[in-house]
Amino acid sequence: MEKNKMVSQGNQEPTATPDTMVQPFAAIPFPPPPQNGLSTDYGSQHTQEYATQSTEHGIPLYGGGQSHAEHSTPATSTANASSTTDGSQTEGQQSQTQNSENSESKPTPKRLHVSNIPFRFRDPDLRQMFGQFGKILDVEIIFNERGSKGFGFVTFETSADADRAREKLHSTVVEGRKIEVNNATARVMTNKKSVTPYGNGWKLSPVVGAVYGPELYAAAPGLQADVSLATEAGVPLPGPRGVNTYIPLIIPGFPYPTAAAAATTAAAFRGAHLRGRGRTVYGAVRAVPPTAIPTYPGVLYQDGFYGTELYGGYAAYRYTQPATAATAATAAAAAAAAYSDGYGRVYTADPYHALAPATSYGVGAVASLYRGGYSRFAPY
């Protein structure tokens, strides 16, 4: 019995269950990085008491199973983030593709030019004639002060409808008129080159140029000594021998005043009493008799209207009466035989002056013609 007691008292501790036993293959945790200046040996003594992990490096403090789970979590999140990014990129590409398709599929308006349409046509008539081929954005018929000019423009929403209307309606007969339908094009303004009548490219005559630069045209005699020697001048021109020649800033053949007159002219142009009118230079130009200038046509007026005969007397200019008229009757007869119209043209006996108007074209006949077959409001 004592033996039984001894056996029963041999081990009084409860039998350890498998759950409470330590796992034989537990992974050795890595020591955390030093924090707050503490060594790694101190931090590794209490590994099992703290269930936290380092926020800086993400190294777990537990065994291998938990570490694998925690490592797999950021990988999964990274995969999700990458898939989300790919999805957003795909959506962006799809939206861009849709935008490009919308821009490509957007209809392009097209404008047609319709000519030789009936003159009574108005915008609703033209819209009704072309509206069967598609949506019309604008219709315009060109008018002037006398009515329709017989042509207009039709703008379709799409170019396909415009092309179909042009193919169907071109060269069709509407109210006896064969209409023409073509694509409207922008009017091209031709650049007409102005032909300069001067040999060296000058466009201002010396008289007009003297108003802008009196010192230039009122040059001193020393500058006019020899035109051909002034090679350090201003404008190169192709010479007769194929080389560039130079002309000076003065114009050959122009009647320049003297040096004193040039100074007087420049001072007069700067004065306030003339108010910008170049009377001095113009008077100097008029004082010189006109000479033939082949290079500058039209510089000096050689017409008699600007000569001294204009100021020779009103009666001598307007009327050409005989000087030997003794009586008033003789003077009247001479004036009737030769008279003027005020512009220097002298008329004598004209055989056409004796013609009488034809009887068939009287006032009544002309009025009936006007009221019958002719209307001044016809467009053409």
Curated annotation (Swiss-Prot):
Compositionally skewed regions (Polar residues) per UniProt: 1-20, 36-56
Keywords of the record: Cytoplasm, mRNA processing, mRNA splicing, Nucleus, RNA-binding
UniProt cross-references to Pfam families, sorted A to Z: Fox-1_C (PF12414), RRM_1 (PF00076)
Low complexity bias spans: 72-102
Annotated site, Interaction with RNA, chain positions: 111, 119-120, 144, 149, 153, 177, 187
Segments passing through the bilayer: none
Principal subcellular localization: nucleus
Signal sequence segment: none
Gene3D superfamilies found in the cross-reference section: 3.30.70.330
One cellular-component annotation, GO: nucleus
Annotated compartments: Nucleus; Cytoplasm
A single GO molecular function term of this UniProt record: RNA binding
Chain's role: RNA-binding protein that regulates alternative splicing events by binding to 5'-UGCAUGU-3' elements. Regulates alternative splicing of tissue-specific exons.
Official protein name in the record: RNA binding protein fox-1 homolog 2
